[in-house]
């Protein structure tokens, strides 16, 4: 697998953090830095942004960045693992104060939440096994596609059906709670391609020594 892995499906947007769900919350909320404690919702399997190390401790780029920022204001941070498909609902319900975990900024999501300034570019990729021979989107015709439920990749898959949805098996994707589960199925041939964030795919395949096995 080359450094620029996968087929680039679309630009999913810039990675940001988000806070405040409903209109009423938007009018009431102040700066998070003014709070004594904040609860951050995250997918704790999303490498390298927020995940658990071999000792079960949370680590990753977004974990360290958020800790560094809130240390400046002596704000206590609690990290709350959530169902990624329910992240905006968790925000609206007030069970978390913000989402900070590789959360891509999209037009659709901007209608639901308030975003911070963006701090990283992210792409959505179609990753396939080299043994599958799939090196272009058209080769996914009749094939099984996987995606994470609630991900920006799956949202765009539905919003731009002419790219992949209209041709894949069942005109839909097999949905997973985490990319970890999706990669297991990809590796075992239960799906033929996976829609995934570039930052996750590059880290996962490099750290597992499988970079050369995938397109």
What positions do the PLM features span?
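C-terminal motif of bacterial Sec signal peptides marking the signal peptidase cleavage site
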Residues: 15-19
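Ligand-binding cleft/hinge of the Venus flytrap
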Residues: 66-74, 153-175, 205-210
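Extracytoplasmic small-molecule ligand-binding "clamshell" domains
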Residues: 27-102, 175
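A ligand-binding cleft/hinge motif common to bilobed small-molecule-binding domains
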Residues: 86, 103-111, 156-159, 185-188, ...
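Acidic, polar ligand-binding/catalytic clefts
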Residues: 67, 76-139
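Short helices/loops that flank or line small-molecule/ion binding pockets
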Residues: 72, 80-81, 85-98, 112, ...
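Bacterial signal peptide processing site
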Residues: 21-23
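Short loop->beta-strand "edge-of-pocket" segments that line small-molecule binding or catalytic clefts
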Residues: 38-42, 138-155
């Amino acid at each position: 697998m080359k450094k620029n892995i996968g087929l680039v499906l679309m630009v999913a947007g810039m990675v940001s953090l988000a806070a405040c769900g409903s209109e009423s919350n938007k009018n009431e909320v102040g700066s998070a830095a003014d709070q004594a404690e904040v609860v951050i919702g995250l997918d704790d399997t999303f490498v390298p942004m927020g995940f658990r190390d071999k000792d079960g401790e949370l680590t990753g780029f977004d974990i360290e960045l958020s800790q560094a920022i809130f240390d400046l204001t002596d704000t206590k941070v609690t990290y709350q693992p959530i169902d990624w498909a329910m992240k905006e609902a968790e925000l609206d319900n007030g069970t978390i104060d913000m989402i900070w975990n590789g959360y891509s900024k999209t037009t659709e999501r901007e209608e639901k939440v308030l975003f911070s300034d963006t701090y990283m570019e992210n792409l959505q990729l179609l990753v396939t096994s080299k043994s599958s021979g799939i090196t272009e989107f058209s080769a996914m015709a009749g094939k099984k596609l996987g995606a994470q439920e609630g991900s920006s990749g799956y949202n765009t898959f539905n919003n731009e059906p002419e790219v992949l949805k209209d041709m894949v098996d069942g005109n839909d994707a097999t949905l997973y709670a985490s990319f970890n589960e999706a990669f297991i199925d990809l590796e075992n041939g239960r799906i033929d391609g996976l829609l995934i964030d570039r930052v996750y795919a590059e880290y996962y395949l490099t750290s597992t020594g499988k970079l050369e096995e995938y397109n």
